[in-house]
């Protein structure tokens, strides 16, 4: 199944949007100049606590740190972005998942200077089973 043709929702600029309707324009500044930030986040199902997002706060801190380096003004605070992660997992009914938070610049202007551009933020999540054998997850693994 293509990534643009899926059921579910994506958190897009503060709202849950149907997956197929989460769109951006081809003249978006980030598409042309590569000025955007993202993280790759995993969620795992646990017997004790259900689905847990691995090191969510650390990922969010890094996303905001990267945006700061690129002088992107994040339109949401860290707590809102953390809740967006939890919401897309919950709303999509995911147990084992990959999450992709992404901040990118809009299409208000074009050129090398990224001034006066709106920062958009999305959080998408999709089913992604663990690479680890379920038995190994229960008993643990040895790392040398």
List each model region and its residues.
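Conserved alpha/beta cores of soluble small-molecule-handling proteins
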Residues: 1-144
């Amino acid at each position: 199944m293509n990534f643009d043709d899926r059921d579910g929702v994506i958190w897009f600029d503060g709202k849950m949007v149907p997956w197929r309707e989460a769109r951006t324009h081809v003249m978006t500044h980030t598409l042309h100049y590569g000025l955007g930030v993202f993280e790759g986040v995993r969620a795992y199902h646990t017997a004790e606590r259900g689905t847990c997002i691995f090191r969510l706060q650390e990922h969010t801190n890094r996303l905001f740190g990267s945006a700061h380096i690129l002088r992107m003004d994040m339109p949401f605070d860290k707590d809102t972005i953390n809740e967006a992660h939890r919401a897309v997992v919950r709303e999509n009914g995911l147990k084992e998942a990959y999450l992709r938070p992404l901040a990118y610049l809009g299409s208000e202007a074009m050129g090398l200077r990224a001034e006066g551009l709106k920062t958009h933020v999305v959080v998408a999540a999709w089913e992604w089973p663990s690479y680890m054998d379920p038995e190994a997850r229960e008993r643990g693994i040895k790392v040398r």
